[in-house]
């Protein structure tokens, strides 16, 4: 009986942890932006079309994760190409921490940093595969600071993402 009680307690503890965890993946890849449903008390998410054929739906993490505050200050950007969710990006600029790196390592797997280098000084990227998803963690310098980024894309929509990235690259090359 004690073993059963212990298992039941462990299961309830794990179930509670999943309820409290933040779920920013509120839509499936390939679904239209109209499928995004938020709490009625929240303001409408910001929808920004871009010159490359995409639309970015931007939602602050605070609107998605009421209980888990560890990623507050992060923007969640849903990229729609031809009204299909193609990429989910977590963008965290100029924070004095490495919370997206910690999140990525705990969720997708650990990767080694150069010995003796603090996490906040490291710049680079790391890629994981999880089922049909490609996950890339990026820490890079930006104008007046740095940013942490997690890009999640589906292999099923990689051709559309490659075309989109090619358009962005051409435009960036023309700006030099």
Protein language model regions, located:
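Cleavable N-terminal signal peptides
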Residues: 7-9, 19
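Non-cytosolic coordination micro-motifs
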Residues: 20-58, 87-176
């Amino acid at each position: 009986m004690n073993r059963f009680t212990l298992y039941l307690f462990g299961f309830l503890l794990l179930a509670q942890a999943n309820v409290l965890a933040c779920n920013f993946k509120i839509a499936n890849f390939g679904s239209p932006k109209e499928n995004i449903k938020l709490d009625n008390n929240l303001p409408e998410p910001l929808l920004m079309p871009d010159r490359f054929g995409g639309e970015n739906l931007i939602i602050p993490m605070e609107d998605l994760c009421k209980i888990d505050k560890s990623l507050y200050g992060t923007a969640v950007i849903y990229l729609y190409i031809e009204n299909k969710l193609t990429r989910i990006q977590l963008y965290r600029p100029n924070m004095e921490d490495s919370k997206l790196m910690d999140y990525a390592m705990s969720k997708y797997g650990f990767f080694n940093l150069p010995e003796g280098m603090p996490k906040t000084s490291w710049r680079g990227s790391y890629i994981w595969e999880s089922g049909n998803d490609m996950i890339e963690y990026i820490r890079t310098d930006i104008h007046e600071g740095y940013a942490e980024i997690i890009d999640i894309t589906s292999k099923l929509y990689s051709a559309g993402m490659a075309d989109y990235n090619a358009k962005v690259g051409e435009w960036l090359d023309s700006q030099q």
